[in-house]
Each structure stands twice: as C-alpha cells, then as structure tokens.
C-alpha cells in the first residue's frame, strides 16, 4: 500500500484497538498512514503499535483479519 505507486492508499481501511474510544476500535484510512517504522503505523499526529491492528479492508472487502487463516493454507 505504501510502496506500490499503483496502489491507492485511500482504498484501505485499517481497524485498530483503541482503549480511548467508546467502541474500543478506531478506523484509520490508508492515506492517513505516512510510514511503518519499528512496528508502528506512523500517522501525522500519532504512532500506533502494529500489534493493535485487527483488520484491514480494501475497497470494502476484508483482506486480512487477526485470527483468520489465509486462504489456501491448511
């Protein structure tokens, strides 16, 4: 998403655990992410540990979810 110039970061939505919100989750749009460094998603105003990521969607479809096995794996 960040390194492929043909990929549009705004198509991605990343859901992270957020202890400060009433729902316990925070939604981050891909174009908010400036970089990924040392296990953190770097936003313009925050750094979020990657271990808090629970789901990634692209174009409204789930492409990764914590605890979900990748397709084709047994």
Swiss-Prot record:
Q: Which superkingdom is the protein from?
A: Archaea
Q: What InterPro entries is this protein classified in?
A: MJ1316, UPF0248
Q: List the disulfide bonds.
A: none
Recorded family membership: Belongs to the UPF0248 family.
> Which named protein is this?
UPF0248 protein MK0350
């Amino acid at each position: 998403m960040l390194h492929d110039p043909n990929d549009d970061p705004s198509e991605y939505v990343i859901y992270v655990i957020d202890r400060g919100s009433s729902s316990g989750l925070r939604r981050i749009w891909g174009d908010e992410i400036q970089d990924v460094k040392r296990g953190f998603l770097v936003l313009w105003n925050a750094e979020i540990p990657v271990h808090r990521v629970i789901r990634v969607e692209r174009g409204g479809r789930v492409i990764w979810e914590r605890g979900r096995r990748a397709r084709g794996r047994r």
